[in-house]
């Protein structure tokens, strides 16, 4: 990348505040004509980084509005270019007139996310930080906002960059052993590279775990309530959402489709999904509901297998329902929930150290529901203090997984054959995968997809 702005010919403009009426509306401009536009609209260019109050003029020198103007000369601005902000009254008509005035003077309308894209291309922030801006805007809880802010401040990027530096150092030793085989010290044979590779793999695992939690905090964990008809699945959904989200009756097969609710538990986002009772049925509509239930179960982050505690004392899912367990793609994501303990006489004591964990509750009375909430927080890795965490996306997890696979291959090569050339290739693959996170190696179409999801004016 270059330290000088890449966009030298055009200046972009956009309304940076949300649509509708408001006390203040902001027009943002970035590009080489920003200073000239300031002089044409304000009559002069404000002193850099000083707020100036005054009128905004149209082409006939008539006052369109009055407000505050701020000028940030590049490269010391958000985008790295000359930036002008016009803060006027937040009515749609005023904002449209001001924006039209900017366009008439030569600015063009910005694409969604183009300001952040220019900041990225001009080395003002990396790709993970740019994505964190959108995550901060979209945050649905305080914890998610705090994670996004840490990513914006560089927490995620710093950890990824440290990993890349380790891989570069590893490549130096490996390629030295390949290029200079006559040297007395063989880094591949003396264990130094193996130790460094193992350390890099462990560090990558730590970053991957933190990123996984960050992605869950950003996107929310998918929790699917599954079980036979009349086990109390809809009642549990209502208990978790604390409202009548689903119809509850004693008639089997009342729920025939997937019901989704988005909730927070102490700031932790959850997508709770109620499903049709699982059974063989001749009813064509109910069959569709059962098929959809299995679709949700198979992609869930957590499956709550709800059992009517009045019908069985069994707590082993393999004994209760071996066909269900056998079909699960991730049995380790299962929690057994024994419902209706108000009728069975069981206590609300949970057995969370068993496999799978067991939670006892009454969805009808609410007894034990708080224990289930705490269990969900625990399996998600959520706690009140989110220090050291950061926001992450699915594409970041994919890149980390590919880097991990490459390191695994490298370790196998080293242990099996000591093949330096193959190890060097694996290290390059891992480095490139990690560099995609910060944007050092990123395809143009991916950049377009990422920044295209931003707000206009960001």
Curated annotation (Swiss-Prot):
Primary location class: cytoplasm
Enzyme Commission (EC) number: 3.6.-.-
Protein residues bound to K(+): 230, 249, 251, 254
Names of the cofactor(s): K(+)
Record InterPro entries: G_TrmE, GTP-bd, GTP-bd_TrmE_N, GTPase_MnmE, MnmE_dom2, MnmE_helical, P-loop_NTPase, Small_GTP-bd
Binding of GTP, residues: 230-235, 249-255, 274-277
Top-level taxonomic group: Bacteria
Lineage: Bacteria, Pseudomonadati, Pseudomonadota, Gammaproteobacteria, Oceanospirillales
Protein family: Belongs to the TRAFAC class TrmE-Era-EngA-EngB-Septin-like GTPase superfamily. TrmE GTPase family.
Provenance organism: Chromohalobacter salexigens (strain ATCC BAA-138 / DSM 3043 / CIP 106854 / NCIMB 13768 / 1H11)
Domain TrmE-type G: 220-381
Annotated localization: Cytoplasm
UniProt: Mg(2+) binding residues: 234, 255
Biological process annotations from GO: tRNA methylation; tRNA wobble uridine modification
UniProt name for this protein: tRNA modification GTPase MnmE
Biological role stated in the UniProt entry: Exhibits a very high intrinsic GTPase hydrolysis rate. Involved in the addition of a carboxymethylaminomethyl (cmnm) group at the wobble position (U34) of certain tRNAs, forming tRNA-cmnm(5)s(2)U34.
Gene name of the encoded protein: mnmE
């Amino acid at each position: 990348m270059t330290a000088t702005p890449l966009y030298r010919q055009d200046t972009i403009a956009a309304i940076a505040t949300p649509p509708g009426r408001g006390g203040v509306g902001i027009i943002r401009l970035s590009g080489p004509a920003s200073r000239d536009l300031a002089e044409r609209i304000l009559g002069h260019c404000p002193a850099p980084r000083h707020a100036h109050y005054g009128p905004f003029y149209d082409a006939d020198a008539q006052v369109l509005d009055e407000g505050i103007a701020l000028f940030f000369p590049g490269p010391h601005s958000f985008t790295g270019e000359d930036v002008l902000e016009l803060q006027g009254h937040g009515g749609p008509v005023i904002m449209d007139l001001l924006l039209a005035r900017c366009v008439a003077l030569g600015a063009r309308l910005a694409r969604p996310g183009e300001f952040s894209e220019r900041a990225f291309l001009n080395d003002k922030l990396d790709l993970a930080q740019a994505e964190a801006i959108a995550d901060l805007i979209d945050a649905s809880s305080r914890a998610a906002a705090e994670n996004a802010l840490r990513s914006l401040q560089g927490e995620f990027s710093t950890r990824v960059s440290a990993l890349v530096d380790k891989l570069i150092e590893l490549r130096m030793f490996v390629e030295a052993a390949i290029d200079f085989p006559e040297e007395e010290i063989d880094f591949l044979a003396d264990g130094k590279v193996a130790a460094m590779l193992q350390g890099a793999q462990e560090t990558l695992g730590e970053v991957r775990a933190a990123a996984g939690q960050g992605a869950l905090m950003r996107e929310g964990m998918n929790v699917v309530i599954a079980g036979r008809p009349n086990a109390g699945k809809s009642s549990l959904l209502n208990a978790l959402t604390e409202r009548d989200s689903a119809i509850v009756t004693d008639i089997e097969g009342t729920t025939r489709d997937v019901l989704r609710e988005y909730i927070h538990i102490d700031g932790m986002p959850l997508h709770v999904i109620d499903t049709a009772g699982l059974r063989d049925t001749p009813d064509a509509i109910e069959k569709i509901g059962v098929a959809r239930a299995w679709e949700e179960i198979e992609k869930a982050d957590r499956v709550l297998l709800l059992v009517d505690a009045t019908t069985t004392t069994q707590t082993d899912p393999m004994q209760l329902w071996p066909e269900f367990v056998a079909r699960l793609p991730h049995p380790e994501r299962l929690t057994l929930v024994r419902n209706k303990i108000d009728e069975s006489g069981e206590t609300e004591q949970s057995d969370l150290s068993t496999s799978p964990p067991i939670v006892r509750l009454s969805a009808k009375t609410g007894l034990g529901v708080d224990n289930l909430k705490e269990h969900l927080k625990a399996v998600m890795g959520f706690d009140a203090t989110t220090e050291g965490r950061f926001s992450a996306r699915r594409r970041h997890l994919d890149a980390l997984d590919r880097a991990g696979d490459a390191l695994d291959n490298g370790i196998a090569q080293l242990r099996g054959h000591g093949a330096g050339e193959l190890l060097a290739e694996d290290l390059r693959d891992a480095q490139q995968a990690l560099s995609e996170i910060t944007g050092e190696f990123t395809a143009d179409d991916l950049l377009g997809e990422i920044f295209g999801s931003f707000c206009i004016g960001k």
